[in-house]
Swiss-Prot record:
SMART domains: DEXDc, HELICc. It comes from Enterobacter sp. (strain 638). This is UvrABC system protein B. GO terms for biological process: nucleotide-excision repair; SOS response. Belongs to the UvrB family. The gene is uvrB.
């Protein structure tokens, strides 16, 4: 099933890209464990990484610091490698409230979660691709370091079907039930199967567009075919097929029975400890909760919160690292850590926060001590498991630079010839009035301005002041969720307003070519928000505009300011010299606003191919491409209902057209999911 990686791009590497590709490739071939790609904003770091992957032909995991950047990278990689397996692996929770106990108020908060089915399907598709083929790129968030089902158990549970194999129908149905597939002869949907005479239809959990038909003759598999579950159109006849479990956490019955015995032993030991310490309430609470879980596991094979017993279910010892997505990555895989100065500290912080919450649950008798082993990886475990790694950042952290040593690859020259912004330092005393005049000058020529302040109060006051003076301004603060944040950025690019004020939110991954000015207020206040890295990242937001400029308001030049200004000047000088030597005239970017959200259009079109000549792919309406994410979600629900209605009325062509449109809208929604 594996193919060769084939890079699809109208562009050839230029600027610093060819040298960066050569050095990274040579380093990996020489066995270097750590390399850093120091690439400025807009220098085509993703394109460089894509070229390295295509040259080396190795399965790759790309780690991003958040879902928004992961979605952006997924869209770019999907365009670069349309014929290969580009997968998306982020947290599948739309909403997640972990169980917790607050001793001060004696409040227990039950776990509450809402799972996004589309993202769950993409996660299953990602692990399947890693197990089946080598031309795989998995774009993941830091969710990848959290516990996942053991790959060995996952592989053992698979159901292999081949033409001509001898197996009776009941055996297949029993195996499907073990894989947690549910029989549903009425509503055929993902993760279900239906039976009609000697024909079994299975809708694989990792698929969103094709189902499997198993035709039996007596006790022999006579024919296997893939078909469109909506129209019934047969896509292809195949020789073999592997049915993967419906969930990563599926466990064989014998392992569950063994786990239950181990849990009983631990419960007896823990009860003894609690009674010795005169913790009668905690002992009663723990006994009651654990006994209930054991009964559920015995009857159903699972229970609510079964992940808290994951140590026993995966057969690990106390304190051992949990199985994660890294266990599915082949030994010669490649790891790319995007925006590494943010992602690496995140990986280190996940374990500590999780541990503190669970220790309270254990102490007060809500969970057994083994629940502490249901956790994300520790940083040391991540280091031990990580394959050869490329750290990608415009401002690499100390960790990456220390690990890479001399192996830091500079990518400063942009293919477009754009230079880093001009930097000016101006006094604090007149910063607000000076900023107002700069905003007005840019609003006239239809350019945008980003302003970053030190405190929430100052951001609110500045926004109010600018509004009073007739400026079109919005304020981006920490209470705004990802979806609304995407809407605000889109509105800024569309020209609904001219100025965006924020604190620490105007940094990594915001591609806004319309922004020509970045103003940093109180730049001389040394600290986290005004460190060298923060300043360089913020200045970089104006690097995609031909008139890019950054104004730092400060009465003195701090060490961080001096380093940031010096580094930016070094880059400008190198970029300018390259342009002179090669006769390049800088060109501004003309990136369509919908490009931020329209990540999966190409994917939707390729998936629509080859499913019957009666099908005509439906292009997404241009209006839909600029819908807000909330409106997109509502539109998706409406179309799902319409599609099922068409199918029930046997109007298969109309249902298929609606389904094509759904594919596109779901991909648009991923960006803000």
């Amino acid at each position: 099933m594996s193919k060769m990686f084939k890079l699809n791009s109208a562009f050839r590497p230029s600027g610093d890209q060819p040298e960066a590709i050569r050095r990274l490739k040579e380093g990996l071939e020489d066995g270097l464990a750590h390399q850093t790609l120091l690439g400025v904003t807009g220098s085509g770091k993703t394109f460089t990484v894509a070229n390295v992957i295509a040259d080396l032909q190795r399965p790759t995991m790309v780690l991003a610091p958040n879902k928004t950047l992961a979605a952006q990278l997924y869209g770019e990689m999907k365009e670069f490698f349309p014929d290969n397996a580009v997968e998306y692996f982020v947290s599948y929770y739309d909403y997640y409230q972990p169980e917790a106990y607050v001793p001060s108020s004696d409040t227990f908060i039950e776990k509450d979660a809402s799972v996004n089915e589309h993202i769950e399907q993409m996660r299953l598709s990602a692990t399947k691709a890693l197990l089946e083929r080598r031309d795989v790129i998995v774009v993941a968030s830091v969710s990848a370091i959290y516990g996942l089902g053991d790959p060995d158990l996952y592989l053992k549970m698979m159901l292999h079907l081949t033409n001509g194999m001898i197996i009776d129908q009941r055996a297949i149905l029993r195996r499907l039930a073990e894989l947690q597939y549910a029989r549903n002869d009425q509503a055929f949907q993902r993760g279900t199967f239906r039976v009609r005479g000697e024909v079994i239809d299975i809708f694989p959990a990792e698929s969103d567009d094709l189902a499997l038909r198993v035709e039996l003759f007596d006790e022999e598999v006579e024919r296997l075919s893939l078909f469109d579950p909506l129209t019934g159109h047969v896509d292809s006849v195949i020789q073999r097929f592997t049915v993967y479990p419906k969930t990563h956490y599926v466990t064989p019955r014998e392992r569950i029975v063994q786990a239950m015995e181990d849990i009983k032993v631990e419960l007896a030991e823990r009860r003894k400890v609690l009674l010795e310490n005169n913790k009668l309430l905690e002992e009663q609470r723990l006994s009651q909760r654990t006994q209930f879980d054991l009964e559920m596991m015995n009857e159903l094979g699972y229970c609510s919160g079964i992940e808290n017993y994951s140590r026993y279910l995966s057969g690990r010892g106390p304190g051992e690292a949990p199985p994660t997505l890294f266990d599915y990555l082949p030994a010669d895989g490649l790891l790319v850590v995007d925006e590494s100065h943010v992602t690496i500290p995140q990986i280190g912080g996940m374990y500590r926060g999780d541990r503190a919450r669970k220790e309270t649950l254990v102490e007060y008798g809500f969970r057994l001590p083994s629940a502490l082993d249901n956790r994300p990886m520790k940083f040391e475990e991540f280091e031990a498991l990580a394959p050869q790694t490329i750290y990608v950042s415009a401002t690499p952290g100390n960790y990456e630079l220390e690990k890479s040593g001399e192996d830091v690859v500079d990518q400063v020259v942009r293919p477009t010839g754009l230079l880093d912004p001009i930097i000016e330092v101006r006094p604090v005393g007149t910063q607000v009035d000076d900023l107002l005049s700069e905003i007005r000058a840019r609003a006239i020529i239809n350019e945008r301005v980003l302003v970053t302040t030190l405190t929430k109060r100052m951001a609110e006051d500045l926004t109010e002041y600018l509004e009073e003076h007739g400026e079109r301004v919005r304020y981006l603060h920490s209470d705004i969720d990802t979806v609304e944040r995407m809407e605000i950025i889109r509105d800024l690019r569309l020209g609904e307003f001219d100025v965006l004020v924020g604190i620490n939110l105007l940094r990594e991954g915001l591609d806004m070519p319309e922004v020509s000015l970045v103003a940093i207020l109180d730049a001389d206040k040394e600290g986290f928000l005004r460190s060298e890295r923060s300043l360089i990242q913020t200045i970089g937001r104006a690097a995609r505009n031909i008139n890019g400029k950054a104004i730092l308001y400060g009465d003195r030049i701090t060490a961080s300011m001096a380093k940031a200004i010096s580094e930016t000047e070094r880059r400008r000088e190198k970029q300018h010299q390259y342009n002179l030597d090669n006769g390049i005239v800088p060109q501004g970017l003309n990136k369509k606003v919908v490009d931020i959200l329209a990540l999966g259009q190409g994917l939707a079109k390729t998936k629509a191919k080859g499913r019957g000549k009666s099908r005509s792919p439906v292009e997404a309406d241009p209006v839909e491409l600029v819908l807000t994410p909330k409106a997109l979600q509502q539109k998706i629900h409406e179309l799902e209902g319409l599609m099922m209605q068409h199918a029930q009325n046997l109007e298969f062509e109309e249902a298929a057209q609606v389904r094509d449109q759904l594919h596109q809208l779901r991909q648009l929604f991923i960006a803000a999911s």
